[in-house]
């Protein structure tokens, strides 16, 4: 219970202080502009979290009865699914966010592309921790890194003030990214692999970097394709949306079609579709 309380306090320091610092340094107007983008990201995150919330119970069952090798296999599958969904949403957000805000609220409410990108990076970094946090929770590894979460919050506040005064809203969001990267983004996977699976964590970090490279490459290709689109705002948005749906997923299928995790998820998806067909 003590570890959970400390983790909650750290979470508040990381997640709930940015708006206070933004309004203090840049004013309420900047907070309001940023809130439109935060709303989009929170909506995406809520949808994706429904998927991973359903997985947590299954992971708990696997951890209770299966071998360590089976646990690691399921971890890799969930981590792969995690990457696919969050990388796809991150790419789509960067390309579509300003168009959505322009259509819904007007062009005067859009933020610079650098702020959109750093917001999306924070979304991706947190999202990529889902598999790790799921296993950390179901394995009961709360004690590992409990004080580091508070450290993340303290670093975030200090850097947000320093970088916020220098670069404004971008600096505050960059501070959040840095505070996570230097603490729990590397330590939580380390704890799960070393103390949960009794395994070398370097394989995870190698996979993380591989997925990151694929994500950046996919984003670059998708963005080039989207930049070709011309026309009025609504028509451009529709075409960009189609591009964001098709190109990342097609590229992921081409790149990962032979990977064990993809094959497993494909077979599972086929099984679900067949069950739905029988019911209908």
Region roles according to the model:
Residues 4, 21-42, 108-114:
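Interfacial/gating helices of multi-pass transporter permease domains
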Residues 37, 41-79, 133-138:
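Helix-loop junctions and terminal segments of transmembrane helices
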Residues 7, 11, 15, 34-53, ...:
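Transmembrane helix-bundle signature of multi-pass secondary active exporters and lipid flippases
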Residues 120-152:
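Membrane-interface junctions at transmembrane-helix termini in multi-pass inner-membrane proteins
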Residues 48, 72-127, 157-161, 165, ...:
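Alpha-helical transmembrane segments of multi-pass membrane transport and lipid-handling proteins
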Residues 199-200, 223-280:
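Membrane-proximal transmembrane or re-entrant/amphipathic helices at the cytosolic face
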Residues 1-15, 20, 58-73, 191-209, ...:
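Interhelical loop/hinge segments that connect adjacent transmembrane helices in multipass membrane
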Residues 143, 150-185, 189, 193, ...:
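Membrane-interface helix-loop junctions in multi-pass transport and translocation proteins
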């Amino acid at each position: 219970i003590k570890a959970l309380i400390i983790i909650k306090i750290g979470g508040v320091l990381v997640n709930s202080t940015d708006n206070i610092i933004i309004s203090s340094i840049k004013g309420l107007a900047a907070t309001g502009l940023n809130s439109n983008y935060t709303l989009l990201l929170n909506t995406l995150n809520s949808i994706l979290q429904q998927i991973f919330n359903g997985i947590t119970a299954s992971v708990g069952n696997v951890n209770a009865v299966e071998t360590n090798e089976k646990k690691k296999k399921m971890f890799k599958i969930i981590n792969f699914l995690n990457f696919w969904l969050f990388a796809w949403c991150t790419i789509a957000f960067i390309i579509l966010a300003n168009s959505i805000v322009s259509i819904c609220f007007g062009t005067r409410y859009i933020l610079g592309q650098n702020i959109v990108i750093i917001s999306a990076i924070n979304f991706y970094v947190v999202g990529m921790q889902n598999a790790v946090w799921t296993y950390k929770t179901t394995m009961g590894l709360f004690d590992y890194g409990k004080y580091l979460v508070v450290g993340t919050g303290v670093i975030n506040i200090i850097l947000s003030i320093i970088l916020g005064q220098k670069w404004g809203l971008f600096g505050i969001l960059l501070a959040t990214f840095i505070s996570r990267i230097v603490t729990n983004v590397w330590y939580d996977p380390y704890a799960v692999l070393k103390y949960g699976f009794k395994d070398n964590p370097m394989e995870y970090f190698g996979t993380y970097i591989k997925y990151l490279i694929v994500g950046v490459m996919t984003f670059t290709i998708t963005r080039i394709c989207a930049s070709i689109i011309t026309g009025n705002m609504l028509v451009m948005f529709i075409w960009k949306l189609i591009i964001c749906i098709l190109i990342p997923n097609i590229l992921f299928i081409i790149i990962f079609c032979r990977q064990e995790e993809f094959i497993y998820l494909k077979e599972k998806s086929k099984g679900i579709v067949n069950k739905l067909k029988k019911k209908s």
